[in-house]
Amino acid sequence: MTTHQSIRRLSRIAALVGLAFVAGTVAAADGKAELQALPEAKAGNADMVELGKHLFFDTRLSGDMGVSCASCHDPAKGFSDGMPLSAGYPSVEYFRNAPTLINSRFKNVFMWDGRLDGADMGTLVRDMLTEAHTMNMDSRLMQERLSQVPEYVAMWQKFRKDDINGMRVYGVVGEYVKTLVSQNAPIDRFLKGDGSALTSQQKDGYEIFTGKGGCVACHNGPLGSDGQVHNTGVPENPEVLKNPNRTVTLLRHYATSGMPNYMNARTDLGHYAISKDPADMNKFATPSLRELKYTAPYMHNGMLTTLDQVVDFYNQGGGQGSELTPLGLSGSEKKALVAFLEALSGEPLNVVAPTLPDYQPRQFGKN
């Protein structure tokens, strides 16, 4: 059997068996996995979204008031940060790449290790605000800080009649994040019937993506992700062990996840730290393929800096321990695939940070 036939056979098996191999795969009526256009995004409460936008850019939501959500999810960088490994909380430093927040509302799972349900945006925001290695915020302190900003109190009361509640702030920020959706991506126009939306080279790439390459077996649905965890053998980022701060943050993550024998771990074990199932060693959630033009570097640890490198990596069958099979793509086929991947990016989301209101502490006895 040729490499081409092997890949096509694996793709057919993945599509037919479904839950047994790639649970959550989006399939067409004929059973084959497919890409889909983004669904319409239901508009949220405009007043809640506006407050959420302010809070997204406000450093008062972090423990030392040194970072905001936008520090690691910068609109100018595709709501990512452009670095291989996220800086995380000041002086702590993180051990994974900061993914884009664009299209988060459509995700099946959050986090590279797939530990959070994609339907629960509020929990994602809560974890990012309160985790010691991201924003290190106490909800009670956050509640009091925001309550000392009259403009925020007024904005809050446009959609709620009670006082600002720290636990409810997570949902408010989440409502803003839900508004971050790709705009006018060529792939969406193409999938809706506009044959002119893709160039001839991109169409060739689409055929490779859905055919010879077998990419669609895992990269399907509106995001180009099955929402499952897989081992593609991405090499370790040596910076994690070279930098003691990042090493400590990794081990702290293992400890709080209840991973056995975590002090002996010196690699990022992915979903295993969550499931404790040895079969999940080195497995990470399939990333979205949306907005790749703006969100380099790639993979869970930023080890691949260009889309050409990504395609080369998959063409060779991934890295050590990978579940993948070499694709056998020619140079022109690889270029076509890269061109197609770029078509999954829409127009830049040009978001301007709002002017943030100042504190105006209330006086005791006069509230």
UniProtKB/Swiss-Prot annotation:
Q: What is the lineage of its organism?
A: Bacteria, Pseudomonadati, Pseudomonadota, Betaproteobacteria, Rhodocyclales
Signal peptide interval? 1-28
Q: What is this protein called?
A: Cytochrome-c peroxidase IdrP2
**Compartments reported by the entry:** Periplasm
Q: Does the keyword Transferase apply?
A: no
Instruction: Report the EC number(s), separated by commas if there are several.
Output: 1.11.1.5
Domain Cytochrome c stretches: 47-157, 200-345
**Where along the chain is heme c 1 bound?**
C69, C72, H73
Predominant subcellular localization, coarse grouping? periplasm
* Enzyme class (EC, first level): oxidoreductase
State where heme c 2 binds.
Answer: C215, C218, H219
The record ties this protein, via InterPro entries, to: Cyt_c-like_dom (IPR009056), Cyt_c-like_dom_sf (IPR036909), Cytochrome_c_Peroxidase/MauG (IPR051395), Di-haem_cyt_c_peroxidsae (IPR004852), MauG/Cytc_peroxidase (IPR026259)
